[in-house]
């Protein structure tokens, strides 16, 4: 997949302002040693027998990274898979990925933010701001992190409230009318209560110039005049608030909330529109660029426009063009010719609340986290990418999830241990369809639209020990059992479409296909590894088993089906 990178920092102006404690922004070596929590405890990255790429907040700032997807440029063995010009993206770690980008499908690479799992694959693309560090763990991580981490995971840890007052503000101005502001402030609010408030806004102007006539395409009920809009713009806002409460000398309670809102234009690619030229007998004798057609129609016969827009002969092969007589734009410059170009077709909104309790008892540490997230997404695009907007794809999704984790940990002279319980609930409502007939490819007419609901409940118990066989040799063993229940309802409705730009799902009509099904699964993950320390080096070899829960497919035009769990066993030494 090719990602459009505008090198925002080329013309960037950055202002960093310390509200207090100038030492917070003192020059440091950004490649210093990093502490990670890959094994649910704070450890130096060089002491962990896992393939990890980690970034501190200072490193992220020095590299100019502003989005989670930009991490792949600096992480070996990690890439992105996706579609719609990069607007739907899934992490690929060591080749473990999937090609189902529907919002109800969870990815085999798990993504966490501050200990909270992101169930939606589309939530994996988010802006980076006020981040303490990011850890990318490669290989199965099912023992401690659970389901759907067969390929690995991306763990983002944000900056936390501080006792001393500190903060920063950054402003960036860059090419294509990009203006980005990021800032945070942290400090003590009252005795034993600390707060941190951070956020950012990014306004990105249109990168692609659309030479199609403004307003030439019909209106849409999504609220925008069609045609002519320049493309690949971005409007993102995000905010995070955290309150940290001291609970005596042994514990703390962290309450946090987050909100984000993103608006993007639709996928940028489309072939160059053409107009066919016919002689008096109706034979196609030429094809010209639509931009050179003064009559603004698909077909000109004997000098007269005989067909309006999108009504010409769909099959008119021409030298250098495709079967429909259209031409590839060749990707030269920043120009496109798109009739279906609306400025607000892709919207993503998310919000979340979390409460995290840490408490140190005399013989063990206790951790509890309650986490709620809500994710909404709307997508619209001309899916066929031809000169005529014949197959307008749209999807809408709402995902609500709640997770609860209880974890216990401790250590003695020869043993480190961690164990716990985990619960996850996900409710997904998802619809998708084509605003145009999938059989005749005519605008309007009958269309098939899919409407599905998926409810997931997952329960697990897990544990892992690190036992010192000698001063230099450690045996690591872990096991996780997961019970997962899924309830699925899917319907395909065929509706008479009166608007060729918007899908219309009428649930009062008879469903062409219905599937009501449930699936219960018993899953297990495991880890067995030996670690040997020599001087400042750590050598390890082991076996890891990860699982991704089975679920239900919901293709665009129906054909619902259950797919089995995925199992991955990895043998690794390093």
What is each stretch, according to the model?
Residues 106-108, 120, 129-138, 143-239, ...:
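Outer-membrane beta-barrel translocator/receptor signature
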Residues 207-230, 267-339, 383-392, 431-451, ...:
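Solvent-exposed loop segments that connect transmembrane elements
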Residues 65, 190-192, 202, 246-250, ...:
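Outer-membrane beta-barrel channels and translocator barrels
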Residues 228, 234-417, 425:
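Outer-membrane beta-barrel domain signature, strongest for Gram-negative TonB-dependent receptors
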Residues 29-164, 573:
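Acidic, small-polar-rich N-terminal luminal/periplasmic segments of exported/outer-membrane proteins
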Residues 171-175, 201-205, 259-263, 361, ...:
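Transmembrane beta-strands of outer-membrane beta-barrel pores
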Residues 167-169, 195-199, 253-255, 355, ...:
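Transmembrane beta-strands of outer-membrane beta-barrel proteins
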Residues 244-248, 408-409, 420-424, 454-574:
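Structural signature of Gram-negative outer-membrane beta-barrels, strongest in the C-terminal barrel
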């Amino acid at each position: 997949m090719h990602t459009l990178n505008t090198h925002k920092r080329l013309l960037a102006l950055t202002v960093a302002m310390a509200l207090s404690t100038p030492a917070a922004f003192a020059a440091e070596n950004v490649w210093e040693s990093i502490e990670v929590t890959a094994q649910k405890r704070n450890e130096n990255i060089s002491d962990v027998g896992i393939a990890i790429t980690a970034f501190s907040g200072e490193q992220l700032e020095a590299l100019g990274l502003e989005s989670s997807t930009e991490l792949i440029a600096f992480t070996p063995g990690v890439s992105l898979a996706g579609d719609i010009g990069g607007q739907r993206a899934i992490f690929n770690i060591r080749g473990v990925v999937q090609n189902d980008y529907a919002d109800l499908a969870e990815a085999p690479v798990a993504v966490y933010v501050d200990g909270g799992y992101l169930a939606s694959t589309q939530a994996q693309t988010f802006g980076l701001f006020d981040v303490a560090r990011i850890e990318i763990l490669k290989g199965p991580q099912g023992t401690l992190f659970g389901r759907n981490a067969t390929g690995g995971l991306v763990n983002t840890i944000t900056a936390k409230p501080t006792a001393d007052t500190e903060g920063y503000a950054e402003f960036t101005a860059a090419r294509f009318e990009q203006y980005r502001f990021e800032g945070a402030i942290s400090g003590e609010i009252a005795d034993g209560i600390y707060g941190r408030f951070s956020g950012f806004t990014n306004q990105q102007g249109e990168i692609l110039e659309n030479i199609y006539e403004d307003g030439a395409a019909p209106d849409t009920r999504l609220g925008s005049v069609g045609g002519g809009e320049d493309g690949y713009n971005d409007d993102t806002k995000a905010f995070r608030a955290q309150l940290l409460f001291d609970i005596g000398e042994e514990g703390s309670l962290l309450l946090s909330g987050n909100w984000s809102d993103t608006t993007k234009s639709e996928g940028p690619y489309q072939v160059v529109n053409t107009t066919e030229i016919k002689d008096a007998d109706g034979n196609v004798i030429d094809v010209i660029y639509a931009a050179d057609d003064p009559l603004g129609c698909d077909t000109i016969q004997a000098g007269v426009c005989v067909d309006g827009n999108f009504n010409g002969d769909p099959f008119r092969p021409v030298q250098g063009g495709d079967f429909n007589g259209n031409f590839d734009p060749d990707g030269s410059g920043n120009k496109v010719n798109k009739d279906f170009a609306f400025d607000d077709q892709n919207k993503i909104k998310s919000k979340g609340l979390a409460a995290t309790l840490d408490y140190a008892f005399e013989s063990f540490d206790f951790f509890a986290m309650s986490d709620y997230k809500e994710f909404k997404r709307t997508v619209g695009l001309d899916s066929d990418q031809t000169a005529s907007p014949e197959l307008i794809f749209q999807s809408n999704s709402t995902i609500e999830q709640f997770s609860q984790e209880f974890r216990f940990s401790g250590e003695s002279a020869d043993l480190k241990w961690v164990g716990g319980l985990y619960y996850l609930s996900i409710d997904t409502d998802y619809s998708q369809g084509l605003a145009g007939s999938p059989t005749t490819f005519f605008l309007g007419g009958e269309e098939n639209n899919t409407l599905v609901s998926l409810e997931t409940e997952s329960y697990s118990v897990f544990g892992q020990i690190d036992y010192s066989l000698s001063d230099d040799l450690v045996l690591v063993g872990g096991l996780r059992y997961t019970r997962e229940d899924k309830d699925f309802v899917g319907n395909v409705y065929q509706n008479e479409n009166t608007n060729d730009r918007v899908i219309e799902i009428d649930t009062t009509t008879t469903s062409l296909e219905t599937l009501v099904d449930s699936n219960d699964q018993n899953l297990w993950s495991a880890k067995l590894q030996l670690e040997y320390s020599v001087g400042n080096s750590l050598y390890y070899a082991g076996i890891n088993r990860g699982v991704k829960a089975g679920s239900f497919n919901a293709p665009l035009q129906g054909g619902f089906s259950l797919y089995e769990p995925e199992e991955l066993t990895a043998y690794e030494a390093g």
